[in-house]
From Swiss-Prot:
Protein name: ATP synthase subunit delta
Domain of life: Bacteria
Primary localisation category: membrane
Complexes and interactors: F-type ATPases have 2 components, F(1) - the catalytic core - and F(0) - the membrane proton channel. F(1) has five subunits: alpha(3), beta(3), gamma(1), delta(1), epsilon(1). CF(0) has four main subunits: a(1), b(1), b'(1) and c(10-14). The alpha and beta chains form an alternating ring which encloses part of the gamma chain. F(1) is attached to F(0) by a central stalk formed by the gamma and epsilon chains, while a peripheral stalk is formed by the delta, b and b' chains.
Coiled-coil residue spans: none
UniProt xrefs under Pfam families: OSCP
Encoding gene, per UniProt annotation: atpH
Family of the protein in this entry: Belongs to the ATPase delta chain family.
Species of origin: Rhodospirillum rubrum (strain ATCC 11170 / ATH 1.1.1 / DSM 467 / LMG 4362 / NCIMB 8255 / S1)
Length: 186
């Protein structure tokens, strides 16, 4: 399983690098990155779309047609439309989420930006995201972009990851620590 994951990561990195270099050469980094963020949002919201790109049962032509139609309807840049067509034709659609992530990470590194991955028990409000962004900008000395997700299993609080650093202030972790402390008392 881990070797498959490493293979997906390698495929995603190679395709993302090619897309990045093409977009940079054509002066379209901003448009391509905006399109990829939109595609990421679509993938996050649509289980059906995730299944279409991940399914080995769906043929290359059908995946290509689906991705091309989606890209055209969304008004994506020609580079992104062609890229998605090539990815589907090469039967690499399963790696699209990784390709998007690798592309955006490379762009962020070029711009001196850092991504903070925040997992919270409930969705963050705009005010909370703004306050977190300000605090993280100050703490890291970099421009921070927030990648927020929700995990109700946290019960409350949040887990913040910036690079290799992590702060876990979730209620579930605090309860686990309390449970361990109580075991030592008896």
């Amino acid at each position: 399983m881990s070797s498959h994951k490493a293979g997906v990561t390698g495929v995603a990195e190679r395709y993302a690098t090619a897309l990045y270099e093409l977009a940079e050469d054509r002066g379209a980094l901003d448009q391509v990155s905006a399109d990829l963020r939109s595609l990421k949002a679509m993938l996050d919201e649509s289980g059906d779309l995730r299944r279409v790109i991940a399914s080995p049962v769906i043929g290359r032509d059908d995946q290509r047609k689906a991705l091309t139609a989606l890209a055209e309807k969304a008004g994506f840049h020609e580079i992104v439309r062609n890229f998605l067509g090539v990815v589907a034709a090469k039967h690499r659609s399963f790696a699209v989420p990784g390709m998007i992530g690798a592309f955006l990470e490379r762009l962020a590194a070029r711009r001196g930006e850092v991504t903070a991955r925040i997992v919270s028990a409930t969705a963050l409000t705009s005010a909370q995201k703004s306050a977190l962004t300000t605090a993280l900008n100050k703490a890291t000395g970099n421009t921070v972009t927030i990648d927020a997700s929700v995990d109700p299993a946290l019960l409350g609080g949040m887990v913040v990851r910036v690079g290799s650093r992590m702060v876990d202030s979730s209620l579930s972790t605090k309860l686990k620590r309390l449970q361990l402390a109580m075991k030592g008392v008896g």
